[in-house]
Amino acid sequence: MKENNKILQLIYVAWRERWTDSQWGINIKKVLPRGVSGDVYNLADCLMQQALIGSTANPLVLNYLKHSLCAHLVSHAAVIRCIAKYDKLERVYCITALLEFLASIVDGVTCRIKSEEAVLPSSVVHLVYWLLQIFARTVQHYELYGEISAEQSYMLDQTCVVIDRLSQQQFLLSMLYVGCHEELEICGRIRDKYATIKGSLTNSNFTLNAPQVEQQLQQLAFIEAKHLEMQPLNPPSTLEKISCCVQPLLAVEVLLNPCKDTSYYVAELQMLQRLKKYSNTRLFYEIIRAGFLTLSNVADTSPDTMWGAFMFFKMPHIIKQLHALQRIPGEQPPPADYIPELVEALELLIEDNLLLDFMDTKCSCNMIEFLLNDWTKQQLVNDVHVKKFASQREAASQLLKKCDNGQQTPSNINFIKRAEVPLSGVLKTLCTNKVQDMVNVLCQVPVGNSFELILSVATVEGRLKTFVSRLIQCNENSKPVPGDLGKLCVIRSTLFDVSFLMLTSIVQTYGSDVVLSERGDSFFEKWVRECMVERNKLKNPRQILALCDDSIVDELLLSFSKPEASQLKPNNLSWQETCLNLPGVLHHVLIAWEQETLSSADVKSILDNIKRRLFSFSVCATSFLCAYMYSVKETELLKPLNMIQQFLAPLTSEELSSQENAKERLALSYQIIRKMQHDVHPAPSTKSRLISHSPLVEQFREVWRTVVDAGHLPVRAAQSLESLLLAGGAAWLSTQLVEQLLACKYTRDMSRTMDVVFAVMHLDIEKTTEALLQYVVAPLILRRQGEDINEPQSLVLARLCVYCIISCLESRKGNGTSALTAMKKRSRSHDDEELAANAAKVRKVIGDGSDNSSDFTDTTTGAGLAALLGSTSTSELRTTPLTLREPLQTSVQHIFAVFLQFVSGDELSPKAVFVYQFISLLVECGGERVAPVLRLLPNGLVQQLLKVLVTDDIKVGLISRLYDLRIQAGRLSAVSDLCLWRNMQMARHSIHL
């Protein structure tokens, strides 16, 4: 209090003696202790009270206040707070003087010490409220009386000047943005006051001298992060004429996750849409183009049928869900019979004549018309659009047909749509108890490529699990019934055989994790878990043999070695028992052959007898032999290999005619046996994408050349890259991909390559992201700094890292249902749990589709999907976790620790630029979703970066988005960094107060 009294006395003396500013500065420093701010003794408050003691302001005392501010005796925060506390708004002259004072200092507002930083955001919020009070009071006076005085008009003009200056000062806007998270009550009052001003202006038709001020008031009242400047580094989608990201990403996802529900693909595409800033029209165009592009480059094999089924059965529902999720509440509902954005996308697609010509030639039809005729049933387009687009392609299609002259072999695409009806028929038949009907239907499925087509349709429609479960039930129901003789027994054996072979083929194609439940107790599920050899899932032959019953093995040995003698004895063995005990038979035969107890002719006879009984028996025998081959030396492989080859020996026409539908079942068993043998011991002459004697690097470069030449990611290339990932590991593949990225010479090529690399990393996004952040980026920058880790390479590399982090962060997770947990292509960490997300919108989309819509055709699948979608009403199918999961958290912490070392010096280097680009892109691309990542930023990283990066690239918008402003620690960190930025800017541009 002693110093306060001295200050007041000094003010009286100064005013009475009319001191100059310099005299005031000299004398006030004698009163204040050395090194102590005048804020401690309320110097600004004392001067303000004396300046505004009358009906008009005292200009001399206000000059003393300004001098104290320039001399850093008081802080801007304290002065602003004092002004905002002045509540005698009826004193027009005092208010006008304060407004003029504000206009003179507002461009230089900053903070010098920590204590000031804690006060400034709140002071700015109160100042804005004070300005709005003045504004509201004036316009309300005009509304009541129809006029205002010249003094009031001048005061309003000065208010507009201050508001204009405030709106143009990014630092003050950032302080306001931070302060609004602290002063929630005052922020609410500001918005109420703005509503009052807007109402008064509307009612009174008052014309402002500064027309832009109303928009500025709205900006101040509803301050958001988007109002704060930020240097954009992620290029806008308008610069990309054609995307190189959608097709590779879909190629990888359809390869890895063909069984995933529609919402999985929708979430993936939503993530990509946010990163690339695509409109719905652009996204729909890229999705359809990706489908055509991939189909144009695959042969009539499984990928062809899978992609064709994806286009016809999955893609319409993806587009439908994306459209529903993008709708804004309260927006005018779209037309019921078509999606406007899809029509616009088709108009873009119709211009791609080369692609459509190729597809028309490949499919021997007008592909656009063929596709859209189906989409009309799902109300994606209407008949008018079909006629319009079909007519635009008609002339070209007819010309292509004439040039073709009927020489083109029809593509599987023409038959995919027809496979839907047989699938429904098969599922319906499998629900019955009529054994003969089931045999008749199932034996027709393996004919030609029908089985492949039906599997493709079942996969993308989400009915694969239903198909498998009913096949398993059918296999269970085929057990021999006591008393069955003659034809009925043969029918049951045929039913067991064909269902077993079909199930085994499905497991080989998709993996047991995908199609079987973890604890299924059926015979087939037990046999797969304990006896079947799968790729990358070895079985111990000793454990398989431990399941055998010695008495049954002896009985089977007699039966297969001397079938004539065994026929005289009653045989009560079931087919299931035979399958489980065949390994014991094969083991005895193998040992006896090696010890020369049995001759080659005897072994051949036994193996032929096994195959003649049921073709599934030869599959069970081959599975054991493959497991056995894993456990022996290379010199001991010849005999088991010869035994497998004997199972592949053709049957005579008499043997085939002795069994009904034997030809189809035999062909399917050959296919299964060859695949088992190939996985264990591929033939040396076979050129396989899995087995090669050339170095991995050469294989990778060869695959990458095909990608570059094609301009997209062919399915075969995606399969080869998956094999290289399994062989070389995530770190190796990530390194090779980044090397290809940095080898590009031009920015356009670099961006395209980055898109493909980003998509390829989704072969295992979590492991490749971990490798990228922990083992690739830092060594690369340290080792090659100044060579090719510079602009624009560093920016593209930073963008790749950020894209991968965001994709990894948004990987779907949650409790998940057991059904969906099983729908995995292979063990990828983010597939272990499924996210319970979006509800009402997607449920509505699903509800008004046709009965063939993906993921909901079967009642059990529909229930599972409904449970998956949950009850939240959000437009996103992925939510951001509050904390990061491993290994992402450790990887991010590692790269941030490396960044801290990169900026620890005091020189600007490419390393520091990369750190800035990384952090800026993380904020720009991720928004609020990367909050868990930003929480891991080390203390001091941003401030050190500000000191090193002497350019003007860092803006307040970036700094304000780095911290969680809902908590005090986040606000303090943000203000500290903002004030450092402000002081450095002022020093750099030589701003004098």
Swiss-Prot record:
GO terms for biological process: autophagic cell death; positive regulation of programmed cell death; positive regulation of transcription initiation by RNA polymerase II; pupal development; regulation of programmed cell death; regulation of transcription by RNA polymerase II; response to ecdysone; salivary gland histolysis. Its main location: nucleus. GO terms for molecular function: transcription coregulator activity. It comes from Drosophila melanogaster. Belongs to the Mediator complex subunit 24 family. It is found in: Nucleus. PANTHER family: MEDIATOR OF RNA POLYMERASE II TRANSCRIPTION SUBUNIT 24. This is Mediator of RNA polymerase II transcription subunit 24. Component of the Mediator complex, which includes at least CDK8, MED4, MED6, MED11, MED14, MED17, MED18, MED20, MED21, MED22, MED27, MED28, MED30 and MED31.
